[in-house]
C-alpha cells in the first residue's frame, strides 16, 4: 500500500493586497433616512486607482469590506461581527467592484446574533463608513444617516 502524499503548502500570491495607495472606497446609502425598526441598504464600492499593472487583491465580503455604523464615537453596528465566507477579487486599472450591505437598524454586540434578537437603534443621526479590514487608513468618507 502506498502512503498518501502530504498536502503541499498553499502558495502566497505575488499580487499585493489592496490598500489606501491603490484603491478608493465609497459608500452610498439608498436614502438619507429610515424609521426605527427599518433597514438601510448601502452600496459599497471599491475602485482601483493604482498604477501597477498587476493590480491588487481585496476581500469584498462583508468581513473584508467592513461597514461601521457609529453614534458619535460609539460603535453601534459592524458588518463583520458574524462570520462570512471570504470573496477575494483581483482588481486592476479601470476595475470597480460594488456590493450591497444592509444595516438592519439594530445595535450589534461583539458576538454574532440574529438581527431579530438585537435591539433597534433609537431615533437620531448616525454615521456610516466603509473600511478594509487590516488596513485602517483605507476607508470611505463617512456619510450621515437619520433614524426617524
Predicted regions and their residues:
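Short Pro-Gly-centered flexible turn/kink motifs
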Residues: 90-104
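A short tyrosine-centered beta-strand micro-motif
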Residues: 124-130
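Primarily secretory-pathway and cell-envelope proteins
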Residues: 1-92, 131-132, 136-148
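Short linear sequence motifs
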Residues: 81, 96, 119-120
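Beta-strand-connecting loops/turns
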Residues: 37, 123-124
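N-terminal helix-cap/turn-to-beta initiation motif at the start of protein domains
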Residues: 13-15, 117-123
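Signal that preferentially marks extracellular ectodomain short beta-strand elements
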Residues: 100-120
Amino acid at each position: 500500500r502506498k502512503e498518501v502524499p502530504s498536502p503541499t503548502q498553499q502558495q502566497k500570491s505575488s499580487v499585493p493586497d489592496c490598500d489606501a495607495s491603490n484603491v478608493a472606497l465609497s459608500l452610498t446609502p439608498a436614502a438619507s433616512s429610515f424609521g426605527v425598526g427599518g433597514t438601510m441598504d448601502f452600496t459599497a464600492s471599491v475602485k482601483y486607482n493604482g498604477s501597477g499593472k498587476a493590480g491588487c487583491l481585496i476581500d469584498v465580503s462583508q468581513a473584508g469590506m467592513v461597514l461601521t455604523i457609529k453614534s458619535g464615537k460609539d460603535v453601534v453596528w459592524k458588518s463583520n461581527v458574524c462570520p462570512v465566507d471570504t470573496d477575494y477579487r483581483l482588481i486592476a486599472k479601470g476595475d470597480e467592484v460594488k456590493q450591497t450591505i444592509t444595516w438592519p437598524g439594530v445595535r450589534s454586540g461583539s458576538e454574532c446574533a440574529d438581527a431579530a434578537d438585537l435591539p433597534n437603534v433609537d431615533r437620531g443621526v448616525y454615521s456610516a463608513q466603509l473600511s478594509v479590514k487590516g488596513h485602517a487608513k483605507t476607508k470611505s468618507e463617512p456619510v450621515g444617516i437619520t433614524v426617524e
